A protein has these predicted regions:
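Structural signature of tandem alpha-helical TPR/SEL1-like repeats
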Residues: 30-35, 71-86, 118-133, 159-172, ...
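Terminal, low-structured helical/coil segments at or just beyond the last alpha-helical repeat
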Residues: 164, 181-227
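N-terminal leader/linker segments that initiate helical-solenoid repeat arrays
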Residues: 10, 14-71
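Helix-start (N-cap) detector for alpha-helical repeat units in TPR-like alpha-solenoids
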Residues: 51, 99-100, 142-143, 181-182, ...
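Glycine-centered coil turns and helix-coil junctions that link the paired helices
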Residues: 64-71, 112-119, 148, 152-159
Length: 227
């Protein structure tokens, strides 16, 4: 009973930390994200063989990089993504068959591509491979399809990506999880990139309906013309 209680408390603490991360990400609170990332990094250093601890650190760094990217701070993206990659690589090394660990690794690889041209091509391929493996391991992962869609959004069609592929990925993510505000957010961005502004606004509005606290979604809706 005592072991069960300890396990339950550890899981609950993990959920609480994830919730704190999401709230800080939603309000673009980089100071809070930096603190949470530091705490997660300290925890993983004390548990080198705990894949979940490394994963939690990777997620924290990825959220920090995400907000830095939203605010166009390339230096901060690099500073967050690099340690995040190390954490995610360690999680994958310990448990290579966990799809979510592969997904967050692929996401972090993708986040660093725009800020480091020298390694961009190499990391871009690593990102694609890692996310493809995540989908292979868990074909019903909505998050993995969002991650693949983000990659396709940024990669030109001539290099195997493109906005049309991205839209299909985001639509698949929504099919798998109709309550994914992240999928609707990125669907809106892809629709706007395709000059389909009315559909973009509809997707942004749905994303905000699901998650009213996401500052970046509000910003994207405000800057999208009605037609």
């Amino acid at each position: 009973m005592r072991v069960w209680l300890i396990s339950f408390l550890l899981v609950a603490l993990g959920w609480a930390a994830q919730s704190d991360l999401e709230m800080a990400r939603d309000r673009q609170d980089r100071a809070a994200l930096e603190k949470l990332a530091e705490q997660a990094a300290a925890a993983e250093q004390k548990a080198d063989n705990d894949a979940a601890a490394h994963y939690r650190a990777a997620v924290a760094y990825s959220y920090l990089a995400e907000v830095a990217q939203e605010q166009r701070d390339k230096g901060a993206v690099k500073r967050a993504a690099e340690p995040g990659i190390r954490s995610a690589e360690r999680a994958v090394a310990l448990k290579p068959d966990v799809a979510e660990y592969r997904r967050i690794l692929g996401t972090l690889y993708g986040q660093i591509v725009p800020v480091n041209v020298l390694i961009g091509l190499s990391y871009g391929k690593k990102s694609q491979d890692s996310i493809a493996k995540a989908i292979e391991l868990d074909p019903k992962s909505s998050e993995a399809y969002v991650s693949r869609g983000v990659g396709n959004y940024y990669v030109p069609s001539g290099l195997g990506g493109g906005v049309d592929l991205a839209i299909r990925d985001f639509q698949k993510a929504i099919e798998l999880n109709p309550k994914s505000d992240e999928a609707y957010l990125w669907l809106g961005l892809a629709m706007r990139k395709s000059n389909r502004n009315a559909e973009a606004r509809k997707a942004f509005s749905k994303s905000l309906e699901l998650n009213p606290n996401r500052v970046w979604t509000k910003q994207q809706l405000e800057k999208t013309p009605a037609n």
